[in-house]
Amino acid sequence: MTVIDNHEALAKEGDNGLSEAGARDYFELLKPRVMSLVVFTAFAGLVLAPGHINPVLGLIAILCIAVGAGASGALNMWYDADIDAIMTRTAKRPIPAGRVAPSEALAFGLVLSGFSVTILGLAVNWLSAAILAFTIFFYAVVYTMWLKRSTPQNIVIGGAAGAFPPVIGWACVTGNVTIESVVLFLIIFLWTPAHFWALALFKMGDYEAVGVPMLPNVAGVPTTKNQIVAYAVLTAIIGVVPSFMGFASLGYGVVATVLGVIFVHCSISVWRMPDGDVKMVPAKKLFAFSIFYLFAIFSALLIDRLVAVLMSGGVGGWL
């Protein structure tokens, strides 16, 4: 079945009326694994920002950011249902599996988008709400509907959507965007290509089948390997910048350096993969470590902040 045929089949399926979707199916539309990373980095931005926020408002902010991220995930699944049905990695998602009708997923995503942005604006501030609205739009429209199927630089440019959560968290506390929040943005933005291109290497067949122009399919594996190393190096460099800005301690800088060296080492292992390697073990290891790297970097920033607060004689600066 081609992408066009599958799109038409899904459209007809959506015209048959409401599905019998359960709460779990709608939860899957939110892309919970992606949401967990969004929530964590947003929380980091909120905690690391100078100043204080009422804990209740902080909780509302995190919930709104989580719901907004889930909403963009639902809109992404709605639009990509045709190719999701063909790719082995995504074929069991709620829409291609027939558990949720496309129209329901669209309505679900739109309602959650409006709800999350409105509540964040009313409860916290409108700058953070505006950035959240832009993030949802960028991911659902700019990336999903345009970049993903039109350019091999899709995840480079589209990666900005995943990099905004710490900026939103920061804006919730400060009401503005500063250079420190931009650094948090850049850590995720520069990390994204190596992370997703590692996945694209061992999922080339899937992307080829649906015509998504991922870099390995368009520019070839050697070029992709070079780009992965380049972005891994950039990620390692930006990862230590907070310690040089006085935004984090030397201890954090040491941890970030070690993590960065391992990240680059994993990328070099991918670069050294022989041509025609079917198993792509180094690429799979890089993909797995990249997830750990991002969680570890932001965890290190949070721990560094907590230690600084405790050493200053209290926990009042934690939130």
Curated annotation (Swiss-Prot):
Designated gene of the protein: ctaB
Protein species of origin: Rhizobium rhizogenes (strain K84 / ATCC BAA-868) (Agrobacterium radiobacter)
Pathway(s) served: Porphyrin-containing compound metabolism; heme O biosynthesis; heme O from protoheme: step 1/1
Keyword Disulfide bond (UniProt): no
Subcellular location: Cell inner membrane
Keyword list, A-Z: Cell inner membrane, Cell membrane, Heme biosynthesis, Membrane, Transferase, Transmembrane, Transmembrane helix
Protein name, UniProt field: Protoheme IX farnesyltransferase
PANTHER family: 4-HYDROXYBENZOATE SOLANESYLTRANSFERASE, PROTOHEME IX FARNESYLTRANSFERASE, MITOCHONDRIAL
Keyword Membrane: yes
Top-level taxonomy: Bacteria, Pseudomonadati, Pseudomonadota, Alphaproteobacteria, Hyphomicrobiales
BP GO annotations: heme O biosynthetic process
Similarity comment: family membership: Belongs to the UbiA prenyltransferase family. Protoheme IX farnesyltransferase subfamily.
Other facts: Carbon 2 of the heme B porphyrin ring is defined according to the Fischer nomenclature.
Molecular function terms, GO-annotated: protoheme IX farnesyltransferase activity
Membrane topology: Multi-pass membrane protein
Function: Converts heme B (protoheme IX) to heme O by substitution of the vinyl group on carbon 2 of heme B porphyrin ring with a hydroxyethyl farnesyl side group.
Bilayer-crossing regions: 34-54, 55-75, 95-115, 119-139, 155-175, 182-202, 221-241, 244-264, 291-311
E.C. number: 2.5.1.141
Catalysed transformations (reactions): heme b + (2E,6E)-farnesyl diphosphate + H2O = Fe(II)-heme o + diphosphate
Enzyme class (EC, first level): transferase
GO cellular component, one term: plasma membrane
